[in-house]
From Swiss-Prot:
It comes from Escherichia coli (strain K12). GO terms for biological process: xylan catabolic process. It comes from the Bacteria. The keyword Hydrolase applies. The keyword Hydrolase applies. This is Putative beta-xylosidase. The record marks D127 as: Important for catalytic activity, responsible for pKa modulation of the active site Glu and correct orientation of both the proton donor and substrate.
Amino acid sequence: MEITNPILTGFNPDPSLCRQGEDYYIATSTFEWFPGVRIYHSRDLKNWSLVSTPLDRVSMLDMKGNPDSGGIWAPCLSYADGKFWLLYTDVKIVDSPWKNGRNFLVTAPSIEGPWSEPIPMGNGGFDPSLFHDDDGRKYYIYRPWGPRHHSNPHNTIVLQAFDPQTGTLSPERKTLFTGTPLCYTEGAHLYRHAGWYYLMAAEGGTSYEHAVVVLRSKNIDGPYELHPDVTMMTSWHLPENPLQKSGHGSLLQTHTGEWYMAYLTSRPLRLPGVPLLASGGRGYCPLGRETGIARIEWRDGWPYVEGGKHAQLTVKGPQVAEQPAAVPGNWRDDFDASSLDPELQTLRIPFDDTLGSLTARPGFLRLYGNDSLNSTFTQSTVARRWQHFAFRAETRMEFSPVHFQQSAGLTCYYNSKNWSYCFVDYEEGQGRTIKVIQLDHNVPSWPLHEQPIPVPEHAESVWLRVDVDTLVYRYSYSFDGETWHTVPVTYEAWKLSDDYIGGRGFFTGAFVGLHCEDISGDGCYADFDYFTYEPV
């Protein structure tokens, strides 16, 4: 069996790999998207399906007002003592010496739940993980953060003992690692194998310099020695490699005795005419940071990536029978169920009566007008990941605005300051019109402002679609679902990426979704009949 990378396409970063018997799970970060954390299941490490979105209550995750790329950073999923343990950080600040990250622990007897109410685990850092030692003791490992550490690029990894009976941490903190010159040490996990403790961590930052480092010690407190190759995995030295930004590893031994590591990676789009080593030459990644897997071999007591330390497109699978799962492809939601499809997420807050309803008009998603796409508070946006470089997304909408501050339509969204929006609104003297708007680094543009597209008075519905074609995308509209007209504006798909947006705290990926806003306060709504996503 051969595994093709990435194994989780689209925005699925910071994988935490976990095994229960012959079942395998990966938990990934969701940042400001709700519900928090996505957990995937596999029986063969090749075919994965989404089985749980555990942080689905405000009591577990309150992100209203969180900044872009705040929220859930680097969860850690483990299985011990007959239950699953999930650690996570809710980051409240991303662009200062303080993160104000709040760390929590929840548990469940089954991956589907029910998940417990959260136990606070301190606010002193991020990327926490839990290590279950062979003697039953448990340890909490994390990256501390504050003004002192922010100014020191050689960041530290700290360990504290954890008492599961009382849910408390020992006040004694032990420093395990102070980093290498790669800097930005984070995402640490502890393992025990063949009499050694192994500390695995990410370094180099979250972009193209990203890497995995490994250390080992005979004692959990250290001292730890660094891997002979320093970096166990990185793609930094191979700018032409199709899988870039590889790092943030999570190690696992299969029930057949084989070793694998999940890691995050990205597939860049390179712009024509830009030299590979020039600024921007490595490319742009609108699909965000995805999840890959590597096969691991042991030599002289150290783990190595088979085939070399770079991320590889194909990997030999474990010695198990392949268990095919649904392949990400054509997707459709007709909104006939009583809850949103698991592929759909909202921004920062749960889908409830404030945002919309699936029962007010059966067979339709009703979205109530709330804040604009620029908001970080109450926003009626329901969206799904881009998982392909070329796809078509489409919807049919019924919407009757009566004020220019009311709109509804289709959006391609990266964060609150970078998105485009094709929508129906209301113009005095004209009635309903179709427009597009783009927000680029928080700078708006309205290319159809002087000549909006009129919606015929008799049109009960407006169909909207977006066609993404690798580097560019375009919106279209129809008034009968058969005859389509292209909006005469072309947008750059590559701009909806970490790489274009830059700076600190931009770690997600492009989404496509439905949106309704009403800043007039009059309480308008839009009804969406279906939402489709089709790779092309």
